Amino acid sequence: EMTSSLVGSEMCIRDRSYTCQWDMTNAGNWTVLTNGDKLWTMEISSPNALSINLLYDKFWLPEGTSLFLYSKDKKQYMGGFTSINNKGDSINLKGFATGIIQGSNVILEYYQPAHISQTAIISICNVVHGYKPIVAPAILTRSFGGSGNCQVNINCPEGEDWQKEKRAIALIVVNGFRYATGALLNTTANDKRPIFLTADHCLGGWGNYNIKYDAVTNPNLNHYMFYWNYESPSCSRGGSEPQILSTSGATILANNE
């Protein structure tokens, strides 16, 4: 089940992940505004990167606060993230992921009104440095537009009757790699619960992904990103990757190998 909330629009380009341990106590700068509100900012630079996205091992925002990410030229931003995006609470902390910011710098900006006493917990554990168009592990070597001749794009004439259904399809991105796909399912209650169906092999356990997730022992997919509307704009292959919307995080309800 997807635990995600809308996090913004961006393009799919990145590939190499670097481990770090930055949080609001050992990185960034705090500023107290004249009205008592607080602002925490942090700039991350990854020289020569085409894009950057961040993974968090701990993420929690108090109600009433907000977090934005934006590029250094301020042409692209993401957020605001709020308490709605929390996967856990301030005690039972869980991870998080944010999508791609184009360029070699990303700026985080956290805003906390003066009347809020609790401070957010934002701990960054990985910086994904994009150095080439999105490429998956060895088993998934094709990039955007590299599908075979047998592939029929959704915007070909054959897809005319599936234009509503295509909105349920998402590309799964894990640690900067284009990883798998899946689709949203409805329930008999028609309650819009975000149930997402994908293949069991998309839960890891092979190649570079030796961590295997399952519904019983390891169900939290907090670092999984879901990219919507990832499609060719026409029937032909190739072209530029689309502007897309992304959501993050899910919990495995059931799986079967």
Residue ranges of predicted features:
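Beta-sandwich interaction modules
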Residues: 43-44, 75-105, 111-116
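Serine endopeptidase catalytic core focused on the charge-relay Asp
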Residues: 100-257
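Glycine-centered tight beta-turn/hairpin loop motif at sheet-sheet or coil-to-beta transitions
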Residues: 49, 74, 175-177
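Extended extracellular/luminal ectodomain segments enriched in beta-structured repeat modules
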Residues: 46-53
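Single conserved hydrophobic/aromatic residue that forms the stacking wall/gate
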Residues: 2-8, 12-13
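Extracellular beta-rich ligand/substrate-recognition surface
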Residues: 26-36, 174-175
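Short beta-strands within extracellular/lumenal beta-sheet-rich domains
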Residues: 34-45
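Short, surface-exposed beta-strand/strand-loop-strand elements in extracellular ectodomains
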Residues: 61-76
